[in-house]
């Protein structure tokens, strides 16, 4: 609640298709590491880093994609990117295949290396998502050797750029993941429960017509949205009862 970001997607439970993502920096309600870096007089770069479109970083390439796969991504990136990276984006945009990875990661790593060579920012945030993608696709126990080797190769491009510019010895490199993952063999559909309780209503085609209580999926968790008139304590008690009933 404090940051304003609790999911990849902006809640729109009545959307007929894919929901928009939180792409734009303005959605974040607290200062970011980029803000603190710039306040300290440092230059910053964000490359396909989540929720950093129009981030204010001097060398920013947003994480964004066009609504449809066949659409030209240029107008979207033009809005999201900083003017200083226009040539770098134009030189590398042919690598993009909509939102698909590993192509997005190949594009991002190449742009990051080019930014380092051209501008040498003090801070760079780079998001590579292929391991995440493969983990979601193959499961916790899937073979990720290929994905790890791929990411290793992309990081090699970035390190090569640092070595060429003489910055590798004076650079702190931090690798991190944005979430963990647990094995799951059962699913619980909270909205089916809410429907039985009369807390949400569906149309004839099964789509959502209205709700008083709604569960928005977020992988192994869910966010429960309530209309203002709904008794929060009552909903909480029902959920606790279900947790006791289904402890797994």
Language model: regions and residue ranges:
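His/Asp/Glu-rich, glycine-adjacent segments
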Residues: 1-139, 244
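Secreted, luminal/periplasmic, and some membrane-associated catalytic domains
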Residues: 7-22, 157-248
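Glycine-rich loops and low-complexity Gly/Arg-rich segments
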Residues: 69-73, 149-153, 198-202
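Stable alpha-helical elements in mature extracytoplasmic
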Residues: 29-33, 108, 147, 151-154, ...
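Residue-level preference for long, well-ordered alpha-helices that form the structural scaffold
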Residues: 97, 101-105, 140-151, 231, ...
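Short secondary-structure boundary/capping segments
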Residues: 61-63, 139-144, 188-194
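Beta-strand elements within well-structured catalytic alpha/beta cores of enzymes
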Residues: 37, 112, 122-129, 144-162, ...
């Amino acid at each position: 609640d404090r940051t304003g970001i609790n999911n990849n997607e902006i809640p729109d439970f009545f959307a007929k298709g894919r929901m928009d993502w939180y792409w734009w920096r303005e959605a974040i309600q607290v200062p970011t590491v980029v803000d603190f870096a710039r306040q300290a007089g440092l230059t910053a770069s964000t490359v396909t880093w989540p929720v950093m479109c129009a981030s204010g970083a001097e060398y920013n390439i947003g994480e964004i994609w066009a609504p449809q796969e066949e659409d030209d991504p240029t107008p979207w990136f033009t809005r999201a990117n900083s003017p200083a990276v226009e040539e770098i984006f134009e030189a590398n945009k042919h690598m993009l295949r909509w939102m698909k990875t590993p192509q997005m990661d190949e594009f991002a790593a190449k742009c990051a290396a080019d930014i380092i060579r051209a501008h040498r920012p003090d801070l760079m945030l780079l998001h590579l998502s292929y391991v995440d993608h493969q983990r979601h696709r193959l499961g916790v126990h899937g073979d990720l050797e290929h994905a790890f080797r791929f990411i290793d190769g992309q990081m090699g491009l970035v390190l090569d750029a640092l070595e060429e510019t003489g910055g590798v010895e004076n650079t702190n490199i931090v690798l991190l993941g944005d979430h963990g993952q647990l094995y799951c063999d059962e699913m619980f559909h909270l909205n089916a429960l809410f429907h039985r309780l009369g807390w949400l209503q569906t149309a004839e085609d099964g789509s959502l017509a209205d709700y008083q209580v709604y569960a928005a999926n977020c992988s192994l968790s869910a966010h429960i949205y309530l209309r203002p008139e709904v008794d929060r304590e009552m909903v909480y008690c029902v959920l606790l009862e279900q947790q006791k009933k289904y402890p797994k």
